[in-house]
């Protein structure tokens, strides 16, 4: 019974059906213009939401899907614009080959809550904070890019991405989640939180210190992780079947507290 009490999550990925099980639909599409360019195609239809106060399921007519069309500086930007909670949540399904950018004020947060997101472009966090409110909230993103003074909170959810590109001064908080990187990347910012960090392919170059990272790090057979700071992998366990490089020949690194387990192929 969702007519009262607290609802966890968001109804954006639910479909509205009639008594016979038929999906109710009356969709329209609209171009979304940014700086004079068509950056996305929006689909509007009947939809369910959990309300601003998470106090039930509500029927409305609104945005149900975003099809990303552009990349780089022309990408669609999401901005909290002073809103919080569900008012700053994007629950519509995000698809397409374009990039998805975020550019809020430093203390503001945009959340994503549709587990059916499957966009393949870059997730470009240019300003503010991003909160994952579902598994695969970042779709099938090819890269997670965090600028200085930005933050991504995985909030206990799972995500697979191509590369990580975290600038110095950024924070990626795994926060009980599970992050898999298939193509490595560069982490010059802070990695924090518990959970799991899996590098299944490519080279991940970790140059920043991450003393608050307690997650288990797993290096797959086809992956390489290069560590340039004693606190790069925090205090979590490191399991490696691939290649783990600690510093350089003339500047070796001793992991501060991590336990390293090496398998036969590691």
Cite the ranges covered by each PLM segment:
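Extracellular/surface-exposed low-complexity segments
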Residues: 1-91, 174-176, 181-183, 199-203
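Short, contiguous hydrophobic alpha-helices characteristic of membrane insertion segments
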Residues: 77, 99-107, 197-199
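Hydrophobic beta-strand segments of well-ordered beta-sheets in folded domains
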Residues: 100, 178-179, 197, 266
């Amino acid at each position: 019974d969702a007519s009262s009490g607290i609802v966890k999550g968001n109804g954006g990925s639910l479909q509205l059906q009639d008594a016979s099980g038929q999906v109710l639909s009356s969709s329209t599409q609209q171009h979304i213009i940014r700086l004079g360019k068509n950056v996305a195609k929006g689909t509007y239809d009947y939809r369910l939401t959990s309300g601003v106060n998470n106090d039930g399921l509500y029927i409305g007519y609104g945005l149900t899907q975003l099809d990303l069309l552009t990349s780089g500086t022309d990408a669609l930007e999401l901005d909290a614009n002073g809103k919080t909670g569900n008012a700053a949540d994007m629950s519509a399904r995000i698809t397409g080959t374009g990039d998805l950018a975020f550019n809020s004020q430093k203390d503001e947060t945009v959340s994503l809550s549709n587990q059916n997101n499957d966009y393949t472009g870059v997730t470009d966090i240019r300003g503010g904070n991003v909160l994952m409110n579902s598994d695969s909230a970042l779709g099938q993103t090819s890269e997670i890019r965090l600028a200085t003074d930005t933050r991504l909170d995985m909030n206990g959810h799972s995500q697979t991405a191509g590369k990580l590109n975290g600038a110095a001064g950024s924070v990626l908080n795994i926060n009980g989640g599970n992050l898999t990187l298939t193509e490595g990347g560069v982490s010059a910012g802070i990695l924090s939180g518990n959970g799991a960090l899996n590098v299944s392919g490519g080279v991940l170059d970790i140059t920043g210190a991450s003393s608050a990272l307690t997650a288990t790090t797993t290096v797959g057979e086809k992956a390489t992780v290069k560590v340039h700071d004693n606190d790069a992998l925090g205090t979590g366990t490191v399991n490696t079947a691939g290649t783990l490089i600690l510093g350089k020949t003339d500047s070796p690194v001793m992991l501060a507290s991590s336990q390293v387990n090496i398998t036969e192929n590691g």
